[in-house]
C-alpha cells in the first residue's frame, strides 16, 4: 500500500513555514535539509520538519495540502503545537551518520 505525506517545515526561527506533499518523506526532508531543491525552502532556509500527516490516498493528501496552504498562520501554529509544542525537528535523527569503532 502506498503512503503519502503532508508536511510542514520551518526555518530555525519558526517565522517561515512551508507546506508540501510527498510519497517519500525521508527523501523529501533530506532534499530540503541538503538544499537540493531550488525555490522557496532553499531561499528561506526551511529545513526543520515540525509536523506531518500520513495518507493512503494521494487525492486526500493533495486536498489536505491545499487546505493547509489556505490556513491562517495562527491555525498552522496551533496544529503544529498540538503534537509538537517545542517545535522540535521530527527528522533530527533520521540522517545521523554512524561511524564504526576503530
Please identify what each model-predicted range represents.
Residues 66-80:
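Short arginine-rich
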Residues 55:
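Short, surface-exposed polybasic/aromatic micro-patch for ligand or macromolecular engagement
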Residues 58:
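C2H2-type zinc-finger recognition helix
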Residues 1-38, 42-52, 62-66, 83-85, ...:
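GIY-YIG nuclease catalytic motif and its immediate N-terminal context
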